[in-house]
Amino acid sequence: MTIILGIDPGSRVTGYGLIKESDRKIAYIDSGCIRTSNDVELSHKLLQIYDGICELMDHYSPTEVAIEQIFMHNNPNSALKLGHARGVAMVAAASHRVKICEYSAREIKQSVVGYGAAEKDQVSHMVVELLQLNRAPQKDAADALAIAICHSHMRNGLSKLIGSRGTKRRRMRL
């Protein structure tokens, strides 16, 4: 059995999602958000993210961690803050000596929905379906679960099937 922690980093809200994988089947464990205080300096926000990820690592002992890669923001300051949040989340996971994999937003959407330009609500819907949840999790938690699901698919080669099927469809339309 593999426990995967998906992380959707953010300087204000960092989403997390935990799934377990056994015999190529996935199941929901937990999800939520690490919310940082508005009234503290960036360094303290980063410490809150670090502590939150470490707490999850200690409590659930995931064997693998997946995190979203940075995408370009229109605002360079936002991109830098996101990079800091992502960095401390990765350091927190690395301090527990687990494998960390990174995925682009397009890879995550392609793996979970089957379409790399899918909308957020489509991703959330598929997270609910794939994990057989009663309701959609919070936005950042749903994104983190999608990252964990993507990692499960990637490590089992399922994304290659999804990607090749999508390519064939595009070729047939030409």
From Swiss-Prot:
Binding site for Mg(2+) 1: D8, D140
Cofactor: record remark: Binds 2 Mg(2+) ion per subunit.
Catalytic reactions on record: Endonucleolytic cleavage at a junction such as a reciprocal single-stranded crossover between two homologous DNA duplexes (Holliday junction)
GO molecular function (one): magnesium ion binding
Active-site annotation: D8, E68, D140
Subunit and partners: Homodimer which binds Holliday junction (HJ) DNA. The HJ becomes 2-fold symmetrical on binding to RuvC with unstacked arms; it has a different conformation from HJ DNA in complex with RuvA. In the full resolvosome a probable DNA-RuvA(4)-RuvB(12)-RuvC(2) complex forms which resolves the HJ.
Protein's UniProt name: Crossover junction endodeoxyribonuclease RuvC
Organism whose genome encodes this protein: Legionella pneumophila (strain Lens)
Annotated gene: ruvC
